[in-house]
Amino acid sequence: MDTKAQDALVIIELYKLRCEPLMRTARAWFVSEFTPQSGRQIVELMLSGQEESAYYRMVASYWETTASLVNNGGVDEQLFLEANSEHLVVFAKLQPFIDEIRQTIGEADYLAHLERLVLKVPNVEKKLENRRSLLKSWSRASRGENQLAVGSGQ
């Protein structure tokens, strides 16, 4: 089997992991219910022992591990980036707080693999801003608030 085919199989296996029931629950929570206001709030959640702490850590560590595989050549970068975009959503939500989290926990490299991978994406700042807008919309929808139609320009 050639390298591209092997990489494709790894990407499919990574996708299957995302479909595990608990991971699906964690991902849904992260996208629609997790609305951090500060890095300190995220650190407090991580240390809380609450169910949501496990959800956060599952999502963050999944994407950090996956990004490490890509960054270190375990999976073809172009193939991965063309097949995935959820890592952009995760990073878009966490990016405003990354520096504060790193300072608070004393780990300068917290989520560094994810950050490095995301920052390689062409037009990344525009894409991250778009993801943040979508996240706000999805969060409002999960709370039952009125939402603007995606793509309405409002």
Where do the language-model regions lie?
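Acidic, Ser/Pro/Thr-rich low-complexity regulatory regions
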Residues: M1-G153
